[in-house]
Amino acid sequence: MNRQLIIAIDGPSGVGKSTLSRRLAQQLRYVNIDTGAMYRCVALAAHRAGLAADDEKSLQALCADMEIRFVRKDGTEKVLLNGEDVSEAIRTPEISLLSSRVSAQPTVRQCMLGLQRQMGEQGGVVLEGRDIGTVVFPSAEVKFFLAATARERGKRRYLELKAKGMDVDLDQTIAEVEARDAADSGRLHAPLRQAEDAVLIDTTCMNIDQVLERMLQVVAERQQVCDPSKEGAAS
């Protein structure tokens, strides 16, 4: 039986982290933890409560009373915030931008950090976000950093929102992706950056299946290294 690994997937918005994390977890029969969705939940709750993104004290209290769970229902992964299915509500452009500002607050990150580590410390998990391999689990056995051009990521996001019936503009969507990049990379606490030992995959000219195949290859190689019994079987 293969050792249960901690797999970290980092990268900017619109690069395919959520889809790939979900499919990789399904293939490996691991638990999928979307850390970005956790910050989106904080942003949604703050928006509903009328809290400012820089009101750190109120945000800290908000996080302390918040329950976030990931469940599978009818074959689909759902995000529950205090028991409510907010899977769609947290994916709007407004909440996406707000989540970047909210996640820049140290107390919010500290609260979410503890929860993320608690969820993943036993292994057998795929975590995706922006600082998994650098901050949340710097000792993760497998680390990926996914990249793509801002224009390609903006186009993907535009098509995703259009498919949901939203009235969006391509140029504006690309601009929002670039703004999110600047916010994520420029924040003081846990900025977006590639871990030194992460495997970089540029997805600009790759489809999901191609990226997934590459990730599965890396995981299989790492399982061979991490499982001492494999060495004995090979000798």
Swiss-Prot record:
ATP binds at G11, P12, S13, G14, V15, G16, K17, S18, T19. GO terms for molecular function: ATP binding; CMP kinase activity; dCMP kinase activity. The keyword Cytoplasm applies. It comes from the Bacteria. Keywords: ATP-binding, Cytoplasm, Kinase, Nucleotide-binding, Transferase. It catalyses: CMP + ATP = CDP + ADP; dCMP + ATP = dCDP + ADP. One of its GO terms (cellular component) is cytosol. InterPro entries: Cytidylate_kin (IPR003136), Cytidylate_kinase_dom (IPR011994), P-loop_NTPase (IPR027417). Its EC number is 2.7.4.25. It is found in: Cytoplasm. The keyword Iron-sulfur does not apply. Pfam families: Cytidylate_kin (PF02224). One of its GO terms (biological process) is nucleobase-containing small molecule interconversion. Its main location: cytoplasm. Belongs to the cytidylate kinase family. Type 1 subfamily. This is Cytidylate kinase. It comes from Syntrophotalea carbinolica (strain DSM 2380 / NBRC 103641 / GraBd1). The gene is cmk.
